[in-house]
Amino acid sequence: MCIRDSNIINGYWNISDNLPMHLCSVSNLIACFILFIPKNNRLFEFLYYAGIIGAFQAFFTPQINNFDGTNYEYLEYYLSHGGIMLLPIYMLKNLGYKLTKYSWLKVVIYLNILLAIVMPLNFIIDSNYMYLAYAPNVSNPLIIGDWPYYILFWEIIIVILTYILYVISTGKRI
């Protein structure tokens, strides 16, 4: 689901909450377009690591905002996150995409570049994209400490998870 128009229709849309600046929103946008553009391994690698790890985390610690009492929000949330997780696996197994030797480390660098863009934006527009302004309002055992310490902890977790995903996916170690 490329565009979350339900927030526009039901009047919940605002710049502080609905720009596609959360990690899964960025991954979702990439997932919508990656199959329609010439083979781009950088986008694939970003989608593979950030999409799978981000969506996996979202499945286990969901935060569904603006729940309007219908099942649409739940369906949209879980179907979009499921698609973010399954598409890069399908691309790896069936479409000839490959993970390069240091792809896991490159994606960590890309994520930090994205962090450097999103963090100041959060303070400018009073938002919490990528949960960089304050911790998400969910029960998450991996949120350790207050801001900014939980972000530093997540930096370590992301490096470990991307490397583990690389080893599992390729069978290679570095």
Regions found by a protein language model. Name each.
Residues 106-113, 123-162:
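Membrane-interface transmembrane-helix boundary segments in multi-pass integral membrane proteins
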Residues 24-36, 80-94, 151-166:
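Hydrophobic cores of alpha-helical transmembrane segments in multi-pass inner/ER membrane proteins
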Residues 1-5:
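Conserved small/polar residues in nucleotide/adenosyl-binding loops
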Residues 12-24, 47-48:
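Structural signature of hydrophobic alpha-helical transmembrane segments
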Residues 36-44, 94-105, 172-174:
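Membrane-interface helix-boundary motifs at transmembrane edges
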Residues 46-54, 105-114:
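Central hydrophobic cores of alpha-helical transmembrane segments
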Residues 62-110:
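A contiguous pocket-lining binding segment that forms or flanks enzyme active sites
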Residues 8-17, 37-41, 63-75:
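Membrane-interface helix caps and helix-loop-helix hairpins in membrane proteins
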